[in-house]
UniProtKB/Swiss-Prot annotation:
InterPro entries: Conotoxin_a-typ (IPR009958). The cysteine framework is I (CC-C-C). Alpha4/7 pattern. This is Alpha-conotoxin QcIA. Negative results: shows no or weak inhibitory activity on a range of nAChRs subtypes, including human and rat alpha-9-alpha-10, mouse alpha-1-beta-1-delta-epsilon, rat alpha-7, rat alpha-6/alpha-3-beta-2-beta-3, rat alpha-3-beta-4, rat alpha-4-beta-2, and rat alpha-9-alpha-10. Residues 1-21 form the signal peptide. Expressed by the venom duct. Belongs to the conotoxin A superfamily. One of its GO terms (cellular component) is extracellular region. It comes from the Eukaryota. Disulfide bonds join C51-C57, C52-C65. It comes from Conus quercinus. Alpha-conotoxins bind to the nicotinic acetylcholine receptors (nAChR) and inhibit them. A synthetic amidated version of this toxin potently and preferentially antagonizes neuronal rat alpha-3-beta-2 (IC(50)=55.7 nM) and alpha-6/alpha-3-beta-4 (IC(50)=90.69 nM) nAChRs. Keywords: Acetylcholine receptor inhibiting toxin, Disulfide bond, Ion channel impairing toxin, Neurotoxin, Postsynaptic neurotoxin, Secreted, Signal, Toxin. Its main location: secreted.
Length: 83
């Protein structure tokens, strides 16, 4: 086997390793993004619940609590929009 053939096989091995590593990394990033999104949703829900249970926070941020109430009771059409 000549030097040129050995070098070609070496490049082929490096390229295939890079491709496999790149695709595996992208697949794991997709799973991480989904987990991050779920964690962010849980954090937002906790902050929303704590704010809406505190009258001064609920008064300061009515857009958050109004949205929470509408999600809990979507048939309630009597809610006035916040100014």
């Amino acid at each position: 086997m000549g030097m040129r053939m050995m070098f070609t096989l070496f490049l082929l091995a490096v390229l295939s390793t890079t491709v496999v590593s790149f695709t595996l990394d992208r697949a794991s990033n997709g799973r991480d993004a989904a987990a991050d999104s779920k964690a962010a949703d849980q954090i937002a829900q906790t902050v929303r619940d704590e704010c809406c249970s505190n009258p001064s926070c609920a008064q300061t941020h009515p857009e958050i609590c109004r949205r929470t109430l509408m999600l809990q009771n979507p048939l309630n059409h009597d809610m006035s929009p916040s100014a």
